[in-house]
């Protein structure tokens, strides 16, 4: 059925997507190899939509455009792309398939998993030859429909206008899942649990504020789908790293009322949540997935980019258009050597920054975004464009500095102003506190303390180079011990091995390099268990891990629930677990309440002491003429570390003395004992500047410091006995 006649679009050709005008909509879609593209206006029930088609003009520089009168917000639509079906040339045009607009601001409906959603012929088992004939069945009733959303004058306050703009040196990141964080929260009304609105509920805000969190980093909230193999097992993609649209919020996280009102209401709910979090002083960072899409490899579904122009949007192996180059482990990788792919990612980032008001982004598998045909480049057009963009360059930009392609591990190699997830920090902390003691218990050697010391000091070996050197500073190191993928902190101390049977892959999925230690017993222990004596040791190990994270130079990232001892029952790859395994449980036993108090106390120490959060890398030189050095290292005997000690793997005890210049020269002494035996430590420092014990990892609750009966103050040269696998923090009295 024909629609109102279209006219050539007069708006700038780079403005892709469907945009509302006074007369109707302007339309533009990028499909350089297509021979024709139609805008399909959809009415009636989604399971049997009536369709009006508008043929777009083009291609001009690969763009297909039109101005279509009479189309209003709320209109459902999609595209159909015409062209050759020649899989050997990478051309997979099939106009029987309704395609999702990559620029859609809203989506309704669910992706189906029948044969109709495939471009090539497949059987009921969804298996077929991707190089075989095109499938003639229409997919309009089996795919989500894009929805026209008017973003010209949005209701409510502007979330981009009240950004907290927390400096990196004061930033504490809290990585959370939109649903999982609040789905079981007892203080939220049922209708808000697991929603965008729930994130901004006063109970959630109060928890984040009391903890000391300054930035809430959300796992993907771009519209996403579940992989067919998960659906066949009755599972879903819980994390959301399977993007269907880079602009539309994932509607399932909205309240039922917003979903019923439509995509505009979903967008309003997201913006309102961001604004409310800003009012509370909390920034919002988004985990964004531009490296691949939900379409999988060539045997996968045909719902958007593959149908618009498979040969253009995706990387191809060795330049052979028939084969996809998978550097992401998902079956496909977007090709960031293409101007249009770079433009799509930039437009999406600007939309979420300017319209939704978020404060930054964590880029999943960011190396893919910096890949040219000859590999990763720190001066890649995408990275330069983000860094220099007036809407983006001043935001918090965090790279996951790897992908699975050749030369894909690039920690420390992203340009300013990017910060990076520091996997070397994670590995060093886990090794020192868990893997090494586990080995030592069996008479095996561990790592030298220099690795942990380097991470405590901000990882200058990774982030101190560049032109000019030392430009980024220690804040570029996003330090973490756990993240969404892998064991939780409580599971790191309770499991030697992953327990992923619930994922339906015979425990083959998930990493085997966990550097965990179960303290002699696999899994949970109860008070009446014969192994109950390992429980306090595990709790101490959690405190050691958390303290090392929070007290290190750099930007700490906490995984939601670690502050209250969340467990995933040993599952270290809970990407498909939308249920109790992954959700945060808010019922606090005594030890979990103590862990929360400890987390709050440690983060308060970080906040109160500039020596723990330096702007620049430590130099080991005086903070001023005649003053103390900004960093010094000492052994258990109180003598300074020399070259030999750094290389002696038998040494497991050290002291780290840090000083921040100021009127009182803020000083913090960290004393670490990673040995399996108690060690007497001669405290470092100046004789005329006594210490106060601010925290001891032996304390189940930080309040024990006031009731321990020990001396409240200590002087340099005094001897303190550190119990096995423990640490202390001293501040000036």
Give residue ranges: language-model regions:
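Carbohydrate-interacting/catalytic domains
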Residues: 1-174, 179, 196, 529-543, ...
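Conserved, mostly hydrophobic/aromatic
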Residues: 29, 79, 176, 218, ...
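Short, flexible loop/turn elements at secondary-structure junctions
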Residues: 31, 58-60, 70-72, 83, ...
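Short catalytic/ligand-binding loop motif for oxyanion handling, primarily in non-cytosolic enzymes
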Residues: 86-90, 157, 182-184, 224-228, ...
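Substrate-binding/active-site clefts of carbohydrate-active enzymes
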Residues: 139, 177-358, 365-391, 408, ...
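Hydrophobic faces of well-ordered beta-strands that scaffold small-molecule active sites
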Residues: 172-174, 216, 284-286, 361, ...
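Short conserved micro-motifs at the rims of enzyme active sites and ligand-binding pockets
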Residues: 185-188, 408-410, 490-496, 500-501, ...
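Conserved alpha/beta catalytic core and glycan-binding cleft of carbohydrate-active enzymes
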Residues: 372, 378-560, 565, 573-577, ...
């Amino acid at each position: 059925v024909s629609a109102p006649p279209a006219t050539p679009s007069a708006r700038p050709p780079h403005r892709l997507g469907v945009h509302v005008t006074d007369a109707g909509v302007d339309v533009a879609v990028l499909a350089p190899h297509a021979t024709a593209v139609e805008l399909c206006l959809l009415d009636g029930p989604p399971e049997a939509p009536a369709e009006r088609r508008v043929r777009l003009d083009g291609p001009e520089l690969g763009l297909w455009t039109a101005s279509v009168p009479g189309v209003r917000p709320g209109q459902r639509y999609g595209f159909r792309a015409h062209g050759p079906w020649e899989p050997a040339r990478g051309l997979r045009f099939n106009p029987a398939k309704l395609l999702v607009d990559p620029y859609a601001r809203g989506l309704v409906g669910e992706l189906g998993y029948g044969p109709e959603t495939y471009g090539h012929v497949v059987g009921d088992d969804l298996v077929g030859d991707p190089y075989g004939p095109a499938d003639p069945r229409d997919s309009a009733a089996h795919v989500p429909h894009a929805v026209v959303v008017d973003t010209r004058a949005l209701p409510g306050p502007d979330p981009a206008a009240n950004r907290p703009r927390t400096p990196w040196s004061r930033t504490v990141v809290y990585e959370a899942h939109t649903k999982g964080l609040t789905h079981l929260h007892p203080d939220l009304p049922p209708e808000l649990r697991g929603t965008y609105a729930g994130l901004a509920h006063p109970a959630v805000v109060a928890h984040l504020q009391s903890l000391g969190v300054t930035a809430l980093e959300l796992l993907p909230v771009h519209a996403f789908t579940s992989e067919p193999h998960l659906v066949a097992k009755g599972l879903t993609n819980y994390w959301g790293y399977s993007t269907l649209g880079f602009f539309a919020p994932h509607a399932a996280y909205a309240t039922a009322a917003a979903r019923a009102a439509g995509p505009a209401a979903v967008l309003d709910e997201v913006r309102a949540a961001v604004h409310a979090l800003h009012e509370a002083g909390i920034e919002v960072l988004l985990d964004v997935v531009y490296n691949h899409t939900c379409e999988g490899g060539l045997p996968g579904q045909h719902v958007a980019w593959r149908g618009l122009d498979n040969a253009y949007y995706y990387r191809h192996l060795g330049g052979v258009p028939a084969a996809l180059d998978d550097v992401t482990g998902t079956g496909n990788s977007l090709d960031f050597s293409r101007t249009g792919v770079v433009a799509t990612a930039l437009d999406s980032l600007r939309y979420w920054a300017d319209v939704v008001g978020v404060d930054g982004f964590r880029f999943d598998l960011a190396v893919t975004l910096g890949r040219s045909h000859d590999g990763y480049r720190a001066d890649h057009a995408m990275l330069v464009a983000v860094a220099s963009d007036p809407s983006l360059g001043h935001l918090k930009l965090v790279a996951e500095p790897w992908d699975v392609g050749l030369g894909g591990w690039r920690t420390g190699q992203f340009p300013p102003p990017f910060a990076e997830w520091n996997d070397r920090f994670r590995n060093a902390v886990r090794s020192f506190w868990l893997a090494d003691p586990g080995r030592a218990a069996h008479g095996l050697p561990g790592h030298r303390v220099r690795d942990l010391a380097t991470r405590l000091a901000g990882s200058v070996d990774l982030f101190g180079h560049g032109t000019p050197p030392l430009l980024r500073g220690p804040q570029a190191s996003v330090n973490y011990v756990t993240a969404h993928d892998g064991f939780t902190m409580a599971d790191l101390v309770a499991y030697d091995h992953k327990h992923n049977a619930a994922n339906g892959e015979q425990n083959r999925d998930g990493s085997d390099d966990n550097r965990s230690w179960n303290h002699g017993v696999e899994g949970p222990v109860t008070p009446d268990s014969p192994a109950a004596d390992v429980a306090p040791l595990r709790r101490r190990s959690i405190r050691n891990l958390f303290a090392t994270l929070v007290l290190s130079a750099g930007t700490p990232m906490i995984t939601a629930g670690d502050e209250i001892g969340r467990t995933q029952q040993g599952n270290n790859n809970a990407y498909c677990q939308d249920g109790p395994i992954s959700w945060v449980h808010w019922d606090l036993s005594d030890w979990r309440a103590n862990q929360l108090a400890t987390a709050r106390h440690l983060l308060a120490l970080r906040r109160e002491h500039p020596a723990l959060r330096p702007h620049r890398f430590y130099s080991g030189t005086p903070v001023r003429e005649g003053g103390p050095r900004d960093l010094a290292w000492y052994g258990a005997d109180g003598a300074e570390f020399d070259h030999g000690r750094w290389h002696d793997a038998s040494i497991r005890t050290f002291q780290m003395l840090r000083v921040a210049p100021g009127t009182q020269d803020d000083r913090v002494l960290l004393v670490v004992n990673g040995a399996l035996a108690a060690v007497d430590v001669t405290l470092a420092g100046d004789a005329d500047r006594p210490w106060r014990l601010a925290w001891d990892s032996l304390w189940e609750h930080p309040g024990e410091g006031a009731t321990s009966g020990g001396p409240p103050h200590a002087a340099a040269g005094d001897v303190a006995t550190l119990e096995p696998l423990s640490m202390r923090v001293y501040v000036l009295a």
